[in-house]
Curated annotation (Swiss-Prot):
GO terms for biological process: mismatch repair. This is DNA mismatch repair protein MutL. The keyword DNA repair applies. CDD domains: HATPase_MutL-MLH-PMS-like, MutL_Trans. GO terms for molecular function: ATP binding; ATP hydrolysis activity; ATP-dependent DNA damage sensor activity; mismatched DNA binding. It comes from the Bacteria. GO terms for cellular component: mismatch repair complex. SMART domains: DNA_mis_repair, MutL_C. Pfam families: DNA_mis_repair, HATPase_c_3, MutL_C. Belongs to the DNA mismatch repair MutL/HexB family.
Length: 656
């Protein structure tokens, strides 16, 4: 008798769930993506115990017809593709037909759904993938799917679940990414009756950024645009002063789908060039529209890995768009924000991307001229059971029955409010949508500005140049400023191979390990791009008989060794990066250092040269060359700006 048997469908679904349903966040992702594919404009996600006890997704999409409800729990049953040709032009987020049966096989699932054409809805209850009941339900256009007791029948999976806070953080991150991908949809995330995130769904991506990362972050984002025959690129990137220590704040979207792609991440960093500090990464939300035939999403069950045709062309488009956006405006960081930035960074990390413990209201401090959140404020939502009335319900009525929220005043109160404030659905929506920053006006101001006309005052600690203009006080780092000047000079020079060479009376010999000798022998032409000509000389040796005139004779051996190290350490060698690294190295080593006194004439000459640079705002390594104290900043420090705490609260436009 043969040993191979065909597994029953329930067991096959549990096996598939091992790939599709890694954790509660995977369930949230699949269900919300189904709601998006159904054309929903409002989606509510309720979770309890980080999704282990309950995940509930409610939408106002097209809904399922009665005969399709039971079929939806069958493996590879889908309405999104019909033949093999459709597999190569996928326009929906889901298409495999694996998610619902896989989720149902490891949970207790309830589906309540109805279409606009049907007179009543349908309710399905399944346990472990087996349908227990299928009955009619009061009509409400859209779908509500409840997933209870996740992994109840696969206890081994629970051993690998991290803390509830960690799992909830993953869920929050998923909703953040989907909100950024679809600003036209209103998303509401509720955990244990507390609202974590609410977006307005008005199509304004920057308002979504403000809801997720905070108003301060949204104000420091610059819009990017670009297109060619194959791609259309839109989105926002942060100013170089707004960075984080990892790539978690970079969101890349292909046709509305969040993906992970190392090469596109690298293209973003190349667009910033040397405006970023080493080891720092920007905020970026890039939305890329592409012909579906150029993207293969059928690579991994999570569909986060996508193979792209013409990937190099897309990288070039991204880098160019970011570089152009950042070249249009003044990139001088505000000094007070720079001083407070590191202290605020940990606080800002907790806004939506990491897990916020409570969603507190915004207040406006007229003295600080900034928004703040009262620590004492608490969040209250009364959750009632949905009405069982057989009459037809609208989506808004349905969600009100689920969350039972009350309207409150749209005004933002001052610090004298009571210590406990009730937050409602409407008030939180006002925070996102009614306070609208005049982002366009801000962008116009930045784009019309130029490098300031600086009047030199004095040198501070033989390191910084104090200057003033009508905009306020400026501090210039003399080393960083000269490094920027020399970097731009050497970058151009290194790109030009001059015939003018200085003959060495005593040639230099460079001895390498055998493996390094082989690599350098193959790549030595790259040194020719910088005017450095090495010849093979004996075993494992190169000889240098002449050097470019821009290279100081006292620094020849050290500089050539560093050039060799750059080539040997680069697995994927880029001539552009090589020239940058080499120019940065030469510029840094030859620039004036800290504690170097300068007379007034030299200081003014340095400032004049800095003003002529293509990018005068940062050195070759991304450190700022100049910081700014505005007149208001200085007056605030001396308490010369005083307003009562009971002044009328400002809107986002007033804040600008």
């Amino acid at each position: 008798m043969g040993k191979i048997i065909e597994l029953n469908e329930a067991l096959a679904n549990q096996i598939a769930a091992g790939e599709v349903v890694e954790r509660p966040a995977s369930v949230v992702k699949e269900l919300v993506e189904n709601s998006i594919d159904a054309g929903s404009s409002k989606i509510i996600i309720n979770v309890e115990e980080a999704g282990l006890r309950l995940i509930e997704v409610i939408d106002n999409g097209l809904g399922l017809e009665k005969e399709d409800v039971a079929l939806a729990l069958r493996r590879h049953a889908t309405s999104k593709i019909k033949d093999s040709a459709d597999l190569f032009r996928i326009r929906t987020l889901g298409f495999r037909g694996e998610a619902l049966p896989s989720i149902a096989s490891v949970s207790q699932m309830t589906i309540e759904t109805s279409t606009a054409e049907e007179e009543s809805g349908t309710k399905l209850v399944a346990k472990g993938g087996n349908i227990e009941t299928l009955e009619p339900l009061a009509k409400r256009v859209g779908t509500k799917i409840s997933v209870a007791n996740l992994f109840y029948n696969t206890p081994a999976r629970l051993k690998y679940i991290k803390s509830l806070q960690a799992e909830l953080s993953h869920i929050t991150d998923i909703i953040n990414r989907l909100s950024l991908a679809h600003p036209e949809i209103s998303f509401t995330l509720v955990n244990e009756g507390k609202e974590f995130l609410k977006t307005a769904g008005n199509g304004d991506l920057r308002q979504v950024i403000a809801a997720i990362y905070g108003i301060g972050t949204a104000k420091k984002m610059r819009q990017i645009k670009g297109s060619d025959l194959d791609f259309e690129l839109t989105g926002y990137v942060s100013l170089p002063e707004l960075t984080r220590a990892n790539r978690n704040y970079i969101t890349i979207l292909i046709n509305g789908r969040f993906i992970k792609n190392f090469l596109l991440n690298r293209a973003i960093l190349e667009g910033y060039g040397n405006r970023l500090m080493v080891g720092r990464f920007p905020f970026a939300i890039l939305s890329i529209k592409i012909d579906p035939t150029l993207a293969d999403v059928n690579v991994h069950p999570t569909k986060q890995e996508v193979r792209l045709s013409k990937e190099r062309e897309l990288m070039a488009l991204i880098s160019k768009a970011i570089d152009e956006a950042l070249s249009e405006g003044v990139l001088i960081p505000e000094a007070l924000e720079n001083l407070q930035g590191r202290a605020k960074e940990k606080e800002s990390l907790s806004v939506q991307t990491e897990l916020p413990l409570q969603n507190n209201p915004l207040y406006y401090d007229n003295v600080r001229q900034d928004f703040y959140v009262r620590e004492e404020a608490t969040f209250k939502i009364n959750k009632n059971q949905a009405s069982n009335d057989s009459s037809e319900q609208t989506f808004d009525n349905f969600t009100e029955n689920q969350l039972n929220t009350d309207a409150v005043s749209e005004k933002m109160t001052d610090r004298t409010v009571e210590s406990t404030t009730e937050i409602t659905d409407n008030s939180l929506e006002n925070t996102v949508s009614n306070f609208e920053i005049d982002f366009d006006n801000e962008a116009k101001i930045s784009q019309s500005s130029t490098f300031p006309q600086l009047e030199y005052l004095a040198q501070l600690h033989a390191t910084y140049l104090l200057c003033q203009s009508k905009e306020g006080l400026y501090l210039v780092d003399q080393h960083a400023a000269q490094e920027r000047i020399k970097y731009e000079y050497w970058k151009d020079k290194i790109g030009e191979v001059s015939m003018e060479q200085q003959i060495l009376l005593a040639p230099y010999l460079f001895t390498l390990a055998k493996n390094d000798f082989i690599v350098l022998a193959e790549k030595k032409d790259l040194l020719h791009e910088a005017g450095v000509f090495l010849e093979e000389y004996g075993e494992n040796q190169f000889i240098l008989r002449e050097h470019p005139i821009w290279l100081k004779e006292t620094e020849i051996e050290k500089s050539i060794n560093e050039m060799i190290d750059i080539i040997l350490s680069s697995k994927e060698f880029s001539l552009k990066k090589y020239r940058h690294d080499l120019a940065a190295m030469v510029a840094c080593k030859s620039s004036i250092k800290a504690n170097h006194p300068l007379d007034a004439e030299s200081a003014r000459a340095l400032l004049a040269e800095l003003a002529t640079c293509k990018n005068p705002y940062s050195c070759a390594h991304g450190r700022p060359t100049i910081v700014h104290f505005s007149g208001d900043d200085i007056q605030k420090m001396f308490r010369r700006i005083q307003e009562t705490h009971r002044s009328k609260a400002a809107s986002w436009k007033d804040f600008e």
